[in-house]
């Protein structure tokens, strides 16, 4: 069972936390991480893009000029794709992109991603994360103190001060523990957990 240092906001170690093997020291299953990520990104797609075909655009179906004798290339309809305002040939049509993944496999993928980040020493645990007032400068100073950037912050319950202090900082995302997902875990270089969030995540993923 791996252990990790717990820090306060001044980067002083205030304790140690034992991490669950099943969540933070699991086998890294790259095929499951790839599948879970592909499914998450696919499910974001609305699939509503559509172009009109020659049968759907407005316009006459009459032959624009006679077949022979004009010197022009033969044409059958002004709604054909080669005409301005004509229909689109082989254009996109509405499509269902939704994919599904069973709970056990999805949990295993998230555990693999967390274990990968843990093995790469990219996880930091805080005893708590809160600010006495809304201050972007205070949040930036906190990030500099820990020498981290491009971070995902996972809390069990974040305050309004924390949310408003970090929202204008680029490459920082704040999530509650129940919104943890494979894409954000793999996207961000560092992950900051509160101690309560670690326990909440372990409780959910160990079910």
UniProtKB/Swiss-Prot annotation:
Signal peptide: none annotated. Gene3D superfamilies: 3.40.1370.10. The keyword Cell cycle does not apply. One of its GO terms (biological process) is translation. Coiled coil: none annotated. It holds the Pfam family Ribosomal_L4. One of its GO terms (cellular component) is ribonucleoprotein complex. Transmembrane segments: none annotated. Residues 50-75 are annotated as: Disordered. Keywords: Ribonucleoprotein, Ribosomal protein, RNA-binding, rRNA-binding. It comes from the Bacteria. One of its GO terms (molecular function) is rRNA binding. Part of the 50S ribosomal subunit. Belongs to the universal ribosomal protein uL4 family. One of the primary rRNA binding proteins, this protein initially binds near the 5'-end of the 23S rRNA. It is important during the early stages of 50S assembly. It makes multiple contacts with different domains of the 23S rRNA in the assembled 50S subunit and ribosome. Forms part of the polypeptide exit tunnel. This is Large ribosomal subunit protein uL4. It comes from Pelobacter propionicus (strain DSM 2379 / NBRC 103807 / OttBd1). The gene is rplD.
């Amino acid at each position: 069972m791996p252990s990790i240092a717990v820090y306060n906001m001044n980067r002083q170690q205030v304790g140690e936390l034992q991490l669950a093997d099943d969540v933070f020291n699991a086998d890294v299953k790259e095929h499951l991480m790839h599948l879970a990520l592909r499914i998450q990104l696919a499910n974001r797609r609305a699939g509503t893009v559509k172009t009109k075909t020659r049968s759907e655009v407005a316009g006459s179906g009459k032959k624009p000029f006679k077949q022979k004798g004009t010197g022009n290339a033969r044409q059958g309809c002004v709604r054909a794709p080669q005409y301005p305002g004509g229909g689109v040939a082989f254009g996109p049509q509405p499509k269902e992109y939704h994919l599904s993944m069973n709970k056990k496999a999805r949990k295993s993928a998230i555990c693999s991603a967390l274990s990968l980040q843990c093995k790469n020493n990219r996880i930091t645990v805080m005893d708590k994360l809160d600010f006495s007032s809304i201050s972007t400068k205070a949040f930036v100073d906190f990030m500099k103190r820990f020498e981290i950037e491009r971070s995902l912050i996972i809390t069990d319950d974040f305050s309004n001060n924390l949310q408003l202090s970090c929202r204008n900082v680029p490459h920082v995302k704040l999530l509650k523990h129940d919104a943890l997902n494979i894409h954000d875990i793999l996207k961000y270089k560092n992950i900051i957990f509160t101690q309560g969030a670690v326990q909440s995540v372990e409780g959910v993923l160990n079910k």
